[in-house]
Amino acid sequence: MSQNLFNVEDYRKLRQKRLPKMVYDYLEGGAEDEYGVKHNRDVFQQWRFKPKRLVDVSRRSLQAEVLGKRQSMPLLIGPTGLNGALWPKGDLALARAATKAGIPFVLSTASNMSIEDLARQCDGDLWFQLYVIHREIAQGMVLKALHTGYTTLVLTTDVAVNGYRERDLHNRFKIPMSYSAKVVLDGCLHPRWSLDFVRHGMPQLANFVSSQTSSLEMQAALMSRQMDASFNWEALRWLRDLWPHKLLVKGLLSAEDADRCIAEGADGVILSNHGGRQLDCAISPMEVLAQSVAKTGKPVLIDSGFRRGSDIVKALALGAEAVLLGRATLYGLAARGETGVDEVLTLLKADIDRTLAQIGCPDITSLSPDYLQNEGVTNTAPVDHLIGKGTHA
């Protein structure tokens, strides 16, 4: 472990030093006033631990089944786009780190490495995330994932339109990046990132590359045109018929939607508010977790805001089958590449293990709401307190 890197926040600070402001803000920022990203962190304080004493915790197990497969711990590295802007071949670095840790990696539709290239270079448990895009393009991607060995398909449902991210607007961030004097100066102030950028070139939206979309600008335009705001329950049934393996629906924030997805053939759901990047002031998925678990009776996974092992333990105690990591592992990637991701996963694993010992639960599969007390109150500190201080989801 690197000196003075003791938690996820330390990696965020190191990442901030390495990245140009517009790249940092793109991945750190949220929608509009960013109340949602703040709430994603504050919400964990609603639950306090109720430890059980005089329990033998000399031996502890973090192993658990996720969708019927035994894993080293109930975590995944979730889907995030443009990882190549953080570190060269960022998708591959994340996937390899996940494989070494014994957990799945979810490749994004907006990845900088194609579905088939990642499958050729990584032999881990690969999942593929699909946006609500028009069926012709969606079918091609799904069949590529099927034929190259991806085990699970994740449909993201909360991006019918893009979130209004004002940091990006202020920075004039777009794909491809424009080379204004401000951007060039920012790059000069971050030479390590700029040198990587010069050596490896502009990352491509690899799943949208074709003979007609040779430039990144054309790929971004194609992806934008393919977003399908009419995608509905009938389209979900079409996707269910197309994909023969495990199917999860992501982006849900109600127990009723979760139950409907199961009724339509999904094998499970992922509660998510997209890390606060889509709808500002949306509820946290933690606030509907227990109800969704009770209503569906099927695997319920969750993301948005997880930074500590104690956050993860709280979600598991409320019934989540697993937690997906987003910014947490991206901080490690941006700071130190694949090594940084390895280190963040090691930190979180140790944090989970320590929390289990402290609450008197030697086996992670034995977690239950009995270990928690709901305080029902969140931190009401003003949003200005967190801007630029790394408390975003």
UniProtKB/Swiss-Prot annotation:
Its cofactor is FMN. FMN binds at residues 79-81, 108, 129, 156, 250, 303-307, 326-327. CDD domains: MDH_FMN. Its main location: membrane. The keyword Cell membrane applies. GO terms for molecular function: (S)-mandelate dehydrogenase activity; FMN binding; L-lactate dehydrogenase activity. Keywords: Aromatic hydrocarbons catabolism, Cell inner membrane, Cell membrane, Flavoprotein, FMN, Mandelate pathway, Membrane, Oxidoreductase. It catalyses: (S)-mandelate + A = phenylglyoxylate + AH2. GO terms for biological process: aerobic respiration; mandelate catabolic process. It holds the Pfam family FMN_dh. It is found in: Cell inner membrane. The keyword Signal does not apply. It is an enzyme of class 1 (oxidoreductase). Residues 1-377 form the FMN hydroxy acid dehydrogenase domain. The active site is at residue 274. Catalyzes the dehydrogenation of (S)-mandelate to phenylglyoxylate (benzoylformate). Is likely involved in the utilization of mandelate as a sole source of carbon and energy for growth. Active in vitro with the artificial electron acceptors 2,6-dichlorophenolindophenol (DCPIP) or ferricyanide, but in vivo most likely transfer the electron pair from the reduced flavin to a component of the electron transport chain in the membrane, possibly a quinone. Shows very low activity with oxygen as the electron acceptor, and also with 3-indolelactate and medium chain 2-hydroxyacids as substrates. Belongs to the FMN-dependent alpha-hydroxy acid dehydrogenase family. Homotetramer. This is (S)-mandelate dehydrogenase. It comes from Pseudomonas putida (Arthrobacter siderocapsulatus). The lineage of its organism: Bacteria, Pseudomonadati, Pseudomonadota, Gammaproteobacteria, Pseudomonadales. The gene is mdlB.
